[in-house]
Amino acid sequence: MQKWEAPRARPSIAYNDPVTSDFITRLPKAELHLHLEGSVDPLTLSQLSEKHHTPFPWANNRYQPLPNSHRPLTVAEAAALYDYTDFTGFLMAFKAVTERLRDPEDFELIAYRLVEKLAAQGCLHAEVFVSVGVIFWRGQEFDPLFEGLERGRIRGEKDFGVSLYWIFDAVRHFGPEEAEKVVATAIRLQASSVIGIGIGGDERLAAPELFAQVYAQAARAGLRLSVHAGETVGAPSIYGALDVLGAERLGHALHAGDDAALLSRLVHQQVPLELCLTSNLRTGCCAELALHPLRRYFDAGALVILNTDDPEMFQTTLVREYQLAQDVFGFTNEELRQLAANSFRASWLPQERKRKLLNLL
């Protein structure tokens, strides 16, 4: 059988925004909160849909396919999936992507295209979440898919000079047993490219205490620890991430400012805060962009980093996030340079590589 090859897609990095400054595009930077599946653009989703136009062969009855998943999506239909107005719409878009990621070549394709897009934005390093918990939940065999990921990463690094680490992501509301599978797999495949674990999903449905043993196991194995916390609920979730799970970085942390003592601690300990402006706006976690705590956290001395979260699904780019910081929050070029420096400092790169990247600023 002839190997399927998708038509070449160019990076889609403009979303009807004002022209961004050359300074921002050229500014060396890293991205530390980015979901692989959320980087799939409508053209690629349409191509995957054409390739896989039969219902997914579910290995269990826990996960139901979307309506019309038996036919290919046009590019326009794929783009329309990303034009949602609430969190449910986002989940449907995410599901539409994961349904069509079925074989190693699919993962190789999206990993390679992600590296290409990052390079176009002056991003020199990224630490990328892979939804391993979802893959297991669907009954897929992970190892062959990981081999595809690695091929895409290695080709991308060679062609574009952008380094990538993988963070294996579990899902809170799937429970601790499913999370343990994710951690065990990260430990088994731990190498230079598998750097850590994360956990996302609904903070309201599963307390941090449920995952304490899982995170302790990961820490003993030398994996780095990230936690989505304070995105949809308040400060207690962040305290749990820090004190129960031992989080080294916090995803979103929107509600850290609700508790003055907590914010002071985050500043004092320089815990990296992975902020995602457009994501928080589009999911409704932040009512309007001007209310986002980016400026407050930065001025308080917190170690904040700008990120895209799910760039294609939120119709943003890392360049656009930096431009928003300047246009909406008044960040100067020098302050943007500080944000870029934060992204390198908060990364899990070796110290020598960090120094080399920081010297570029």
Where are these regions (language model features)?
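Acidic, Ala/Val/Gly-enriched low-complexity intrinsically disordered segments
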Residues: E5-A9, A14
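Cationic, low-complexity basic patches in intrinsically disordered or flexible, solvent-exposed regions
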Residues: K3-W4, P65
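Metal-cofactor-binding active-site regions of metalloenzymes
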Residues: Y15-L223, T232-S237, V244, E248-R249, ...
